[in-house]
Structure formats: structure tokens, C-alpha cells
């Protein structure tokens, strides 16, 4: 299994729609010249952006967090350019980018150090072969202070690993429950 380069990412995105929308360079400034947390293709990965759609965890209903029976009322929906995550809490968001993962590729997501150095951890499970959709992002604020997430800017990096052989059964083949997801998707069983 080998990690894929910027050339491969560019070709797969431009010719096969692997990443849409796709930024062919690292974008570090907005149209007004203001600094951004970078996004776009890098040497061996692709930095994704966070959309304006957030679900921030709240315990106002004193619910028990149960992945088998998740209560949607545990979140407050926010649409904004900035999301404030309360201390020691978390939020869900989604990528602006829509992904179509090839059958012989596994994609791993890592948080950007800009956020990690502030105590904000990004978690995403691997994008399996032939999975497609917007990626649901999980942000954990590990600090005892409120934390800010910026929509439209880089939040995580995707690394693409191509296998030497095609998998027998892809995510699409087994009818994965998150296949084709759009928007922020809550836990399913």
C-alpha cells in the first residue's frame, strides 16, 4: 500500500471527480488577502474545509449519550462562518468537499496541527473503498475554554493509500450506512 502524491490526487479529482470542489494549490489567503487556515492539495494529501453547518453538543436535556439510540436533541444546529465549541465539549460539522473514493484506495484523515496545538482534536474514521459523500467531522474541544472553528478554512488533511490489489467487498458493495451522506450525519446503527 503506497501513499499517493499531489499529481495523483489532482488527476483523480480533475478526471474522475474524486474531490469536488477541488483546489489545485494550497490556498492560504482569502480574496481580500486575509490569512486563512490553509486548504487544498499538498505534497501527499488534501486539506479539507469545514462547511457552515454545525451541530454543537448540549446537555440541556440531561440525556445519556448512546450510539445505538442517539437523541438528536443533544445538539444545537448552527449555521455560521464561525462555531464556538464549549469547554470540554464537541461539535459535528461536514466538509465542503464531496468525496468519491476509488475501489482500491483507503483514505485516512488527520487533524491539522493549527487546531491540535490549540487543544482542538479532529476525528474522522477512514474513508473506505468506494465510499462517497460529504465527510462528517468530529471536533473535540479538550480545553477548559471555549474554542473557535472557522468555516470555509482548512480543518483536516486526507491521505490516500492505494492498495496493491482490489478489495473483494467495498463499502458500496456492502451497502454501508453512511454511503452518499450529505450534510452533518448523526450516528446510525
From Swiss-Prot:
It is an enzyme of class 3 (hydrolase). The keyword Transmembrane helix does not apply. The active site is at residue 138. Pathway: Pyrimidine metabolism; dUMP biosynthesis; dUMP from dCTP (dUTP route): step 1/2. Its EC number is 3.5.4.13. GO terms for biological process: dUMP biosynthetic process; dUTP biosynthetic process; nucleobase-containing small molecule interconversion. It catalyses: dCTP + H2O + H(+) = dUTP + NH4(+). Keywords: Hydrolase, Nucleotide metabolism, Nucleotide-binding. Belongs to the dCTP deaminase family. Catalyzes the deamination of dCTP to dUTP. This is dCTP deaminase.
